[in-house]
Amino acid sequence: MAIRILRALAAARRATSAIEFAIVAPILVLLATGTVGLSEVIRAQTDLTTAAQTMAQVIATQTLVTTAQISDFCTGSLDEMVPYSTTGLKISVASVTRGATSGTVGLDWHNESCGSGAALTSATTLAASVVPSNGDSTIVVQATYTFHNPLSLVLPATFSLTETAFARPRANTTVTYN
């Protein structure tokens, strides 16, 4: 009797699909969740890149910038991060020039008023390859953003994103800061 039941179970194929689905479904849910979470991180990084490049380009079109103007430009860059929260966004701006006679790269000015705790890590080192000739100047913008992943089932709950953007002054001179 027991052998007959075992043979009947071995020959049965009707529940095979249900068992396969029960095994594969959790894996598919994890993959889908991870894909959505990763695409959100990539989109946040893309928005951060746009915010940094926009800030650099807008400042590079000026010949003179003030703290109030940089604050206004910062507000515009914050809008680039929509629909994400901007509480974790910090943007630092600097102007770097290669000396006309010495050839050494020096910091003209920097502003860290866009986001509390913003810090530009070694602007002169970052911009050294962008200002190859004596007298060349560039605007360096470094944006950092702490992205909070709403789908932290597969990926980490937070990501620290950083983007650096460079822009040459349009007037072919150094952008002064007042």
Where are these regions (language model features)?
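Alpha-helical assembly-interface signal, strongest on the long, hydrophobic N-terminal helix that forms
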Residues: M1-D79
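Short, conserved structural patches
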Residues: Q53-N178
